[in-house]
Amino acid sequence: MAINAQEISALIKKQIENFQPNFDVTETGIVTYIGDGIARARGLDNAMSGELLEFENGAYGMAQNLESNDVGIIILGDFSAIREGDVVKRTGKIMEVPVGEALIGRVVNPLGQPVDGLGDIETTGFRPVETPAPGVMQRKSVSEPLQTGLKAIDALVPIGRGQRELIIGDRQTGKTSVAIDAILNQKGQDMICIYVAIGQKESTVRTQVETLRRYGALDYTIVVTASASQPSPLLFIAPYAGVAMAEEFMYQGKHVLIVYDDLSKQAVAYRELSLLLRRPPGREAYPGDVFYLHSRLLERSAKVSDDLGGGSITALPFIETQAGDISAYIATNVISITDGQIFLQENLFNSGIRPAIDAGSSVSRVGGSAQIKAMKKVAGTLRLDLASYRELEAFTQFGSDLDAATQAKLNRGRRTVEILKQPLHKPLPVEKQVVILYALTHGFLDDVPVDDILAFEEALYDYFDVHYNDLFETIRTTKDLPEEAALDAAIKAFKEYSNFKS
């Protein structure tokens, strides 16, 4: 049999063309140190900052320190099974979290894994946890209001969609309650809410989830939790995971409210990681880039331009102060990044003024342009009236002889303080807020005893719901006050019908 050299040559060439190598080339390193959620590995010379690394037991870590001899890695999750000498390999990817509609109504950890026992989450999309914030030309001015349902906020420190409004105060002053009420008030407002619990007790998170479920708010809310018992890398990454989930909706043209409860604990977790990674400590032992930690997070909240869909992320970051000290390092950092702050005071909270908002220290730098016309008209002088009342109240403690004008200011001030009180988990629609504040600023409450103010308010809403619902409807649809004569007549009719008189 003759051997045809050309046939053999063609056969070999075909085999070479069809050859599929079935081996995988990855850069690997060896773990040289493990402990406290931190690992060090040698041999990963080409690792990128923030790259996802995989340990041989299936655990993942993130490259943080790229040094000449080794790489400092923070471990995302349980690190008890990792040992010195284990192999760690590069993945070539940065950390991503699952995003999309399937997450709504679920409780997940910062890696996007469900922790509520309701089964797997079928998501198709992923977003990196670290992405650049929208640029200057990709943004739009804040112009739409975000109604929190709390009179003290919507009237005095209004928040707009796309704003960052810091909520700051000591522990146990009602910070979480303000945020939960704001989430409850988004029902039917076409908003998606994300509640990021950082370093909270698991029992506390469970309570908040049950509150959201009871009021039907879990239908439009995602809860991201990194509890106090979890390793500090998860506490550090949780807010970034939350805002990555929010960005998916924002770039679809939707509006998102995200609550970070609270960033003080994230800063503490980051300080812990930085010290373990041997980074040089600065003021209060925080690393030098702790400002950047929060600025790159909060800058991702924005109202984006119409070209990008016109969506928004509104952020309510929390900072916990010690003994009301708002000049502490982390507090001043976040105040300078955000568009205003709501300061909750312990002495107001303990004296029964809840929400315990200090109108003097609280400010909204951009929310005023988003406030509806009706609210602007009725709440315009409210802050000044409240400030002058506080001043007069302190002054009149030293003497009892007061002229009629001063006495009238004090009486109005006491009623203002009462009106701004609100029961827990009972946010008010904006039209009801406008009517009661109109009644207050136009003197209709001046002859109502202070102790009866809250009962008067409830009765007024019920009366208007039955007899003057068209006035509520006018405010709701036009965003402006109805005819003042009609509003005056309605309130007078209610006062004649009721018996709230001093």
From Swiss-Prot:
It is a peripheral membrane protein. The record marks S362 as: Required for activity. One of its GO terms (cellular component) is plasma membrane. Keywords: ATP synthesis, ATP-binding, Cell membrane, CF(1), Hydrogen ion transport, Ion transport, Membrane, Nucleotide-binding, Translocase, Transport. GO terms for molecular function: ADP binding; ATP binding; proton-transporting ATP synthase activity, rotational mechanism. It holds the Pfam family ATP-synt_ab_N. Produces ATP from ADP in the presence of a proton gradient across the membrane. The alpha chain is a regulatory subunit. Belongs to the ATPase alpha/beta chains family. This is ATP synthase subunit alpha. The gene is atpA.
